[in-house]
Amino acid sequence: MKAQPTLIALGRIIGVHGVRGWVKIHSECRPREAIFNYSVFQATRHHHAQTLKLLDARRSGKSLIALFADICDRDAALQLNGFTLNVTRADLPQLKNGQYYWTDVLGLTVINRSGEHLGKVCDIFETGANDVLVINKDGQEYLIPFISERYIDRIDFENKYLYVDWQMAWTDDAD
């Protein structure tokens, strides 16, 4: 039996646009429009999956909208609401040595220079100045600036560890 490829979520269908089958897209890509560099998505919602082929896409005001093959009217578009738009790892552009995707960092165990386990990376977000890691430990979340050579010592993807120069005392919510 062939193993299923790991899917990487690039965005989500969040609504309809007009009456001709267009849908609104929330993109997790940076820049947002990069989601339209892909022509085929494995769309998933709960236990349902289907392949969607992109026919056309554009900005509409502040929104991103897309038209998929065989989605010809508003009713068909409404059926897609809530679907996550995924691609396989093989569909992503090849990275240079030392580069990685955010999805690779999610779930890593964070360890500081003292060997203290700080939790797991549960999210990453942009601030404009730098990206920020959201770390979850025992249900409590705190933030670490994602700045290489300042707070990030190294990433060990093989063993799923992220080593940081960070002390819990620097976190306002630390006990």
Curated annotation (Swiss-Prot):
It holds the Pfam family PRC_RimM. The keyword Zinc does not apply. It comes from the Bacteria. Transmembrane segments: none annotated. One of its GO terms (cellular component) is ribosome. Signal peptide: none annotated. The PRC barrel domain binds ribosomal protein uS19. An accessory protein needed during the final step in the assembly of 30S ribosomal subunit, possibly for assembly of the head region. Essential for efficient processing of 16S rRNA. May be needed both before and after RbfA during the maturation of 16S rRNA. It has affinity for free ribosomal 30S subunits but not for 70S ribosomes. This is Ribosome maturation factor RimM. It comes from Dichelobacter nodosus (strain VCS1703A). The lineage of its organism: Bacteria, Pseudomonadati, Pseudomonadota, Gammaproteobacteria, Cardiobacteriales.
